[in-house]
Amino acid sequence: MKGEQQRVNVVAWLILGADFLMMLTALTLTLPPQSFALSVLAPHVAAAVLMAAFGPYLFAGVDWLLVIVLLIGHLWLMHLLVRRVRTFEVFGRWARLARRLALGAAVLLSLLACYYEFPVKEHYEFASSKVSGEPVRLAVISDLHSCSYGGRADPVLCDIAGLNADAVLLTGDIFDDRLSDDNAQNLVKRIVDIYPCFYVSGNHEYWSERIDEMKAWLRSVGVAVLEGECVTLSVKGTRIDICGVDDPTYMSDDQWLGQLKQADEQSDSSHLRILLTHRPERVSDYELFGFDLIFAGHAHGGQWRIPFTGRGGYAPDQYFFPRYVDGRYDLANGSVMLVSRGLARESTPLPRLFNSPEILVLDIGGR
C-alpha cells in the first residue's frame, strides 16, 4: 500500500505540473485564435490525461482526498487562465461575459472528459434464421492492453458478471507489449470462472515477443485460443461455430488468407458462423467468405472522437478519419461486422477523448 501511495503522489504532481505547463503556454501565446483555443482545450486534455492516469486508483478507492485536492487545483488553474488570457480583450465591454463563457466551456469539457473515461455497455441486436431456440447473448472484450479498472470493485468484471451472457469473446490485444500481464490475467481468470471464453491475438501481443507464452497461459486457465480454427458451441438449442484467426502482424497475405480459409472450411454453413479477428480494416478479405457475424477491435474507436458525429479521428492501419472504428457495418457479401472501441486507457500514448471504453453486447434472436 505504501508503494502504491507513492506512485499516486508522483502521478499527481506530474499531472498537475503538465496541467500548469499547458495553461502557461496558452497564457504566453500572442495570437488570439491559439490562445483562445488553448484556454478551453487545455483543461479538457488535462482532465482526460488525469482520468487515464488515475483510473485504476479511482476505481480501487485509493486516496480519494488526494484526487479531490488535485481536481480543485485543476479548476483553480482554469480560473486563473481564463482571467489572464489577453484574447478576451477583443470583446471590449463583453470581455467579462466571454471569460465566463470560456470558463464554463472549459469546466464542461473537463467533466465530459472524465465522464467518457468510464466503461459503458453498448448493446446491439442481430436476427438470424439459424437461431432456433431462445436468444443468444455474446459479450465482447477487446483491446484491454493490460489496463487496470481496479481490484475487487472492478466495474468491467461487475458489468460482465451481470450480463448473463452465453460466451465472452476476446478479440485481441488483451495483453500489452509494455505493461505487465497481471491486470489482464486477473480479469481473464475471473471471467473464465463464469463464462465460456474464446480468444484471438492482437498486434501488441505479437510485438511483445511473448505471444506463445500468453497463449499457453490462456489455454491453461480454460480459454479457447483460435488460430484459424473453429469451435462448435451449442447454446439454447442453437449451434454456433466460433471461428478465429491470428493477427496478421508477422504473416504474409497467403498465410493470413490461409487461416481465414481454414476457419471457413471447418465451420458448418447450417450453423450460425461467427468470426473473431482483431483487424476491422481487412473487410475485403472477410467478404471472400460467408461468415454471418464478424467481431473486431484494434481501432480504439478512433481514439479522439468527434462529438455528436460518431466519427473517430485516427485509427491504426486506417490513419486519419478511419471508416471502421465502432459499431455495426453491413458488408457487401451479407456478413455483419461489429467493431468494439475496446477498453484501453492508461496504456495508450494519447488519452481517449469523447470515447468511452466499452464492453460490446450482442443479442442474437431468430427470425
Cite the ranges covered by each PLM segment.
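Hydrophobic alpha-helical segments, principally membrane-spanning helices and signal/leader peptides
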Residues: 102, 107, 128, 282-283
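Short structured motifs
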Residues: 108-109, 122-125, 227
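Alpha-helical transmembrane signal-anchor/signal-peptide segments
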Residues: 118-132
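Soluble catalytic domains of enzymes that build or remodel membrane lipids, polysaccharides, and related
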Residues: 131-367
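Non-catalytic terminal accessory segments
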Residues: 1-119
